[in-house]
Regions:
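Sequence/structural signature of beta-propeller domains
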Residues: 1-275
Length: 275
């Protein structure tokens, strides 16, 4: 682990963490194999579980073939948006959780993901949405290019309603290559005029099967042009899958990141990352 990464919190009761969002003293966390949205209070260390999927026999550590694969947790105004990756037909769900009224709404992204595949020339083996940003007018979806076609890039969708998307554009983003494996997106957030992303490399060419972890990275894109500003390794052995803004001290940016350890142990570690 490199020096700009330090342990921020250890949370018992959460398994594989795939996304997070910080709102005042509440840290919201999702897992790709969980039917809960977790709310962790940073002051009293209490963990609240919000059930966002009803009628399931298993609510945590859902088997791989059945899991919703929630890889995206993003925020706009009073809503949290939780998106499935789209990597299989079972993973096409979006959950909207309205923070002010504490209500859950479900939306199908099957139609959207079909349009994305056509417009962006991404086949079923290569669609893998791992991050999203919503500005209120535009969506940016981050496709992880860990499939055999290396379709790493940003999908820009004009309009606020994803289920009615019409204008869809794809911008391929070439990051680094390590051990002959491409580094690809695992999450992204917008801060001021820049997109900050985390990315990882794995020894696999599948959006479904995990491989040996070859490292994690942080980088930045210009929010208007999607020009790559920088990419920097933050760990050689860990796979980070979620990022949220923490604080800024002068020119120093601090983020919180979470790790998907691909185990059944219900404990997760949140790290502070300084850039």
């Amino acid at each position: 682990m490199l020096s700009n990464l330090s342990v921020f919190a250890k949370i018992k009761g959460i398994g594989s963490a795939s996304g997070l969002y910080l709102r005042q003293n509440s840290l919201f966390v999702i897992g790709d194999n969980s039917a809960y949205l977790y709310e962790y209070n940073l002051e009293n260390k209490a963990l609240n579980k919000i059930e966002i999927l009803k009628g399931l026999k298993t609510l945590e550590n859902i088997p791989k073939a059945n899991k919703p694969d929630f890889e995206v947790l993003c925020h706009h105004v009073n809503s949290l948006y939780i998106l499935g990756s789209g990597s299989t037909d079972r993973r096409n769900l979006m959950i909207e959780y309205q923070l002010d009224i504490k209500k859950v709404f479900q939306h199908s992204l099957t139609s959207l993901y079909a349009k994305v595949k056509t417009a962006c020339k991404i086949d079923e083996e290569n669609l893998n949405i791992e991050g999203a940003i919503f500005t209120g007018e535009t969506w940016f979806l981050f496709n992880r290019g860990n499939g055999n076609a290396n379709k790493n890039g940003v999908i820009k969708i004009n309009g606020s309603d994803l289920t009615k998307a019409q204008q869809i554009e794809f911008t391929p983003i070439m990051l680094l290559k390590t051990d002959q494996k491409l580094v690809s997106f695992t999450d992204a957030i917008l801060h001021e005029n820049n997109i900050y992303f985390i990315a990882a490399a794995e020894n696999t060419q599948s959006t479904y099967h995990d491989g040996e972890i070859l490292g994690s990275y942080i980088g930045s894109l210009d929010a208007k042009t999607l020009h790559l500003n920088f990419t920097k390794q933050i760990s050689a052995t860990q796979k980070f899958e979620g990022i949220t803004f923490y604080k800024q001290i002068k020119n120093q940016l601090q983020f919180l990141v979470c790790e998907d350890r691909d185990t059944d142990i219900l404990e997760t570690v949140i790290y502070k990352l300084v850039v």
